[in-house]
């Protein structure tokens, strides 16, 4: 097969329906909109969620829960992710953002979790550490410092 022999997949190319271009086209006069009514008008149609006057689903279902404005939000980083850094590196939230480990620093900072194993000797500065994370960091010869 050569470049000039390529053809689109069957059913991939549809013929354009030119609407309102005479009765012989099959899309003339009303252009596929049926006869009079709200949907035949320009800009016609009902708003999203409108169910013809019936009580909409969003209002039939009860409200549930709330958002706690005092919730503490942390970036959670597991210790096994930190293996990719060199021995003796000092790791801070800003450093993690710079290296692309986290996208942005959350309002309460970074929490280091203890999932996986740490083989590197690192100094890690973060807002919170789990017990297992702190133990693994110190077992590898590093330091876990709370900022």
UniProtKB/Swiss-Prot annotation:
Gene Ontology terms: biological process: translation
Regions of compositional bias (Basic and acidic residues) in chain numbering: 1-15
GO molecular function: rRNA binding; structural constituent of ribosome
Assigned keywords, A-Z: Ribonucleoprotein, Ribosomal protein, RNA-binding, rRNA-binding
Top-rank taxon, per record: Bacteria
Pfam families: Ribosomal_L27A
NCBIfam families, alphabetized: rplO_bact
Subunit structure: Part of the 50S ribosomal subunit.
Protein name: Large ribosomal subunit protein uL15
Lineage: Bacteria, Bacillati, Bacillota, Clostridia, Peptostreptococcales
């Amino acid at each position: 097969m050569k470049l000039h022999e390529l053809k689109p997949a069957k059913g991939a190319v549809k013929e354009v329906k030119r609407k309102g271009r005479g009765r012989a086209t099959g899309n003339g006069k009303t252009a596929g909109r049926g006869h009079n009514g709200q949907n035949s008008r320009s800009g016609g149609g009902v708003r999203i969620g409108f169910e013809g006057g019936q009580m909409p689903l969003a209002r039939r279902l009860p409200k549930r829960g709330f958002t706690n404005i005092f919730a503490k939000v942390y970036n959670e980083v597991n210790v096994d992710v930190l293996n990719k850094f060199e021995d003796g590196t000092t790791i801070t939230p800003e450093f993690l953002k710079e290296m692309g480990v986290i996208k942005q620093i959350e309002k309460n900072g970074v929490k280091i979790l203890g999932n996986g194993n740490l083989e590197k000797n690192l100094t890690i500065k973060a807002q919170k550490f789990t017990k297992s994370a702190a133990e693994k960091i110190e077992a590898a010869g590093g330091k876990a410092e709370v900022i």
